[in-house]
Amino acid sequence: MDKLRVLYDEFVTISKDNLERETGLSASDVDMDFDLNIFMTLVPVLEKKVCVITPTIEDDKIVTMMKYCSYQSFSFWFLKSGAVVKSVYNKLDDAEKEKFVATFKDMLLNVQTLISLNSMYTRLRQDTEDIVSDSKKIMEIVSHLRASTTENAAYQVLQQNNSFIISTLNKILSDENYLLKIIAVFDSKLISEKETLNEYKQLYTISSESLVYGIRCVSNLDISSVQLSNNKYVLFVKKMLPKIILFQNNDINAQQFANVISKIYTLIYRQLTSNVDVGCLLTDTIESTKTKISVEKFKQTGINNVQSLIKFISDNKKEYKTIISEEYLSKEDRIITILQNIVNEHDIKYDNNLLNMRDLIVTFRERYSYKF
């Protein structure tokens, strides 16, 4: 919103100066909210008349769009004259034209984002009731699983809730904003503050394309040295995954994915319970973090459920992002060494090549760390 405000101010300043000079009329007071509503109505019309607005749109298309934008719709020039944005553009020198086109283009792109946020904002409010209901059902299933004393009893719980689990997974995997909606249930700021919604959208929106790519990458891991555990949980997952629409529509081998996930789970459990280096790393991290996090602050806040915990983290996210970042960066080399040793020991390959954990982690950090 701050960027849009700057772009809007630039657009208004250039427009007012030229309109007043050319007509001899004085501009009216500026009402940004009023004008943004006009732009939000205008953008779909411009896209229908000219073309879809994208970051790669050509400048001549932007200039064409200027012909359809009449200043008399905006607060600062309301009903004063029939001048269009292109008439101001025509009066500028080449350098000013280039800057004006860039400003107008970026403003339209930001308005487009605002339209998307408004739509998501409305859907968030509508969908939270369903998500609350789903969340309660999920917690109920988890509670029954924890209370199960045998593998057969746990399997029965999963079987009894098979339809709900499949329908919920299909819902989650078909909606790139589902994770965002779950957070909105616990953090009301997403409903009341659009800037917070935009910030969280950058973090927690996961596209179907990204999911499919990630699933394929995991499926293609070669972890043949780890024995497959065909327990009842794995069998349940194997029966369930082929019914997931994302797997059906993208021709993903559900059995292969389930096998790899089972092996990864087995490997992680084994490392957490028997790898001395992993144990030392976790202990050192916990001890180091204790010196940076105030236990008293937790107590004073009165955190007693998931909702209050998420709200606390949201209110203090800048502080905790800094702590996590410092902890990770100070231990990155150690983490990479431990992971590479595990890869080497178990001969874990991707595309017939041994995984290079340093390349993988550094690439991920460079591409995606800005999100966190």
Swiss-Prot record:
GO cellular component, one term: virion component
Keyword Cytoplasm among UniProt keywords: no
Keywords assigned: Host cytoplasm, Virion
Keyword DNA repair: no
Subcellular localization, as worded in the UniProt entry: Host cytoplasm; Virion
Domain of life the protein comes from: Viruses
InterPro entries: Poxvirus_A6
Record remark on domains: The N-terminal domain is not required for crescent formation but is required for virion formation.
Function: Lipid-bound viral membrane assembly protein that plays an essential role in immature virion (IV) to mature virion (MV) transition. Functions in both crescent-shaped viral membranes formation and its enclosure to form immature virions. In addition, participates in targeting mature virion proteins to sites of virion assembly to ensure their correct localization.
Protein family (similarity comment): Belongs to the orthopoxvirus OPG132 family.
Official protein name in the record: Virion morphogenesis protein OPG132
Natural source organism: Variola virus (isolate Human/India/Ind3/1967) (VARV)
